[in-house]
């Protein structure tokens, strides 16, 4: 079931001229890119409710009470903005059935870890508010959340600003019997994935990362994986709207130099 509130394209209509100009520049950069290129599909099925918010789309897992994945396009103009971080976590009104609340995370030993981060949402007040919905949150190790994961979020904004736009999908990697927290039994991921697609020097490039849900500080290159490797681990097919020949090329390998790593 797809729940639509305000699509990203609609939200952009309310933005400044600079936002519109940047969006036009992005469309000129790659006019043949299919719409919603970031939306993945499952290779192996799992419970989900598909929800579309202002700035991102998510697949919510009603058994785990966390997202299966969160996907969005980040554009150059969206890396700028003055909407301040809210730090007010809310129940997602579009989740059917049980949605966790902020108290599930209290004294759990885990951060309320964003998938679509607040730092990517400063361009629009609705986007900022909705990224604090608990459907966009996973239990995340504090040191990971504030450390290497945050470093990658900042890299993503750098890439969007440099290349015009970047397509992003992220989410949890789960065990068969995960630890749970809170009265709503929110599942704790074993690890997290994040994959990126961008047109760099007129060629599509993709790269992925896997982080174990624990403390540690390493060079980002040590987390790198091919998209094919992450698909095998997660059971999710990323960027399926790419032409097959392009998809097969960019997903079998990655080039850290192309991404400036």
Residue ranges and their predicted role:
Residues 1-261:
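Domain-level detector for secreted/extracellular nuclease and nuclease-toxin modules, and
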């Amino acid at each position: 079931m797809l729940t639509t509130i305000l699509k990203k394209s609609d939200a952009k209509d309310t933005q400044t001229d600079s936002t519109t100009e940047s969006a036009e520049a992005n469309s000129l950069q790659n006019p043949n890119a299919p719409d919603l290129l970031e939306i993945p599909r499952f290779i192996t099925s799992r419970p989900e409710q598909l929800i579309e918010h202002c700035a991102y789309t998510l697949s919510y897992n009603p058994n785990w009470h966390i997202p299966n994945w969160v996907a969005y396009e980040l554009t150059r103009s969206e890396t700028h903005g003055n909407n301040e971080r809210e730090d007010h976590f809310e129940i997602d009104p579009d989740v059917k059935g049980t949605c966790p609340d902020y108290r599930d995370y209290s004294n759990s030993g885990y951060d309320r870890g964003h998938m679509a981060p607040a730092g990517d949402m400063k361009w629009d007040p609705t986007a900022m508010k909705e990224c604090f919905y608990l459907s966009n949150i996973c239990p995340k190790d504090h040191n990971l959340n504030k450390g290497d994961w945050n470093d990658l979020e900042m890299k993503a904004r750098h890439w969007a600003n440099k290349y015009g736009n970047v397509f992003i999908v992220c989410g949890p990697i789960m065990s068969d019997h995960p630890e749970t927290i809170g009265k709503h039994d929110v599942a704790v991921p074993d690890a997290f994935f994040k994959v990126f697609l961008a047109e760099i020097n007129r060629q599509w490039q993709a790269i992925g990362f896997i982080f174990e849900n624990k403390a540690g500080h390493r060079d980002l290159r040590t987390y790198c994986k091919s998209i094919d490797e992450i698909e095998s681990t997660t059971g999710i097919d990323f960027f399926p709207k790419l032409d097959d020949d392009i998809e097969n090329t960019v997903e079998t390998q990655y080039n850290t130099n192309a991404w400036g790593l």
